[in-house]
């Protein structure tokens, strides 16, 4: 079962340490305590279109099967206005995006919330970045910034500034969440509400948590 368009929790980014990069087409991260594991990798379809995918494991058990990741961007009008009228226009913006390299870093720290049940929150994670680009002379790039916490997985898309000042018009979020059949979730429709233990297929309306 695939869920699309869900919002990931936003988390404040801090300075990372021990950064190193490698030439690879796959990023693999494990949280500091080995609780969560996430992979990002590229695949090419029979038609020749590229795709970005990811998986998530919890305590060596798959909780998110192979799921699609990425953005759809429509810059056609802006490209034409700047005289770039010969660029490829693939069906999906990600179709000709390729992984160039990945980088890794670690972070260990604490932060103080403005309010809440705890006065001090641990901020420990392993991080990585997937660096992608197009090879069609468009100079488009996309970075996927990933973090693995013992409490969960977080990732976001980052579009580096284009060298020719082409504006990025994001028109769709391609991120999918492929759960195994029978996956259950504790759901609450509003703060201080009651939790229900439901099959994820039953979550047809937005919920707060």
Describe every region a protein language model picked out.
Residues 1-8:
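Bacterial N-terminal signal peptides that target proteins for export
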Residues 8-16:
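Bacterial N-terminal signal peptides
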Residues 16-17, 31:
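A general, composition-driven signal for non-globular sequence regions
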Residues 19-21:
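Boundary at the C-terminal end of the N-terminal hydrophobic targeting segment
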Residues 24-209:
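N-terminal accessory beta-strand-rich subdomains and adjacent acidic, glycine-rich linkers
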């Amino acid at each position: 079962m695939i869920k699309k368009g869900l919002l990931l929790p936003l988390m404040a980014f801090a300075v990372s340490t021990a950064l190193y990069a490698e030439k690879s087409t796959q990023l693999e991260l494990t949280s500091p305590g080995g609780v969560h594991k996430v992979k990002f990798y590229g695949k090419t379809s029979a038609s020749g279109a590229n795709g970005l995918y990811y998986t998530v494991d919890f305590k060596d058990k798959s909780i998110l099967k192979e799921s699609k990741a990425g953005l759809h961007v429509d810059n056609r009008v802006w490209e034409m206005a700047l005289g770039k009228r010969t660029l490829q226009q693939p069906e999906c913006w990600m179709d000709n995006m390729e992984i160039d390299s990945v980088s890794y870093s670690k972070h260990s720290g604490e932060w103080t919330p403005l309010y809440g049940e705890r006065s001090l929150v641990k901020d420990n994670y392993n991080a990585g970045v997937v660096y992608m680009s197009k090879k069609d002379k468009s100079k488009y790039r996309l970075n996927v910034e990933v973090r693995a916490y013992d409490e969960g997985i977080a990732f976001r898309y980052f579009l580096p500034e284009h060298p020719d000042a082409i504006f990025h018009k994001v028109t769709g979020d391609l991120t999918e969440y492929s759960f195994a059949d029978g996956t259950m979730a504790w759901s609450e429709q509003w703060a201080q509400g009651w939790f229900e233990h439901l099959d994820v297929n039953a979550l047809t309306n937005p919920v707060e948590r």
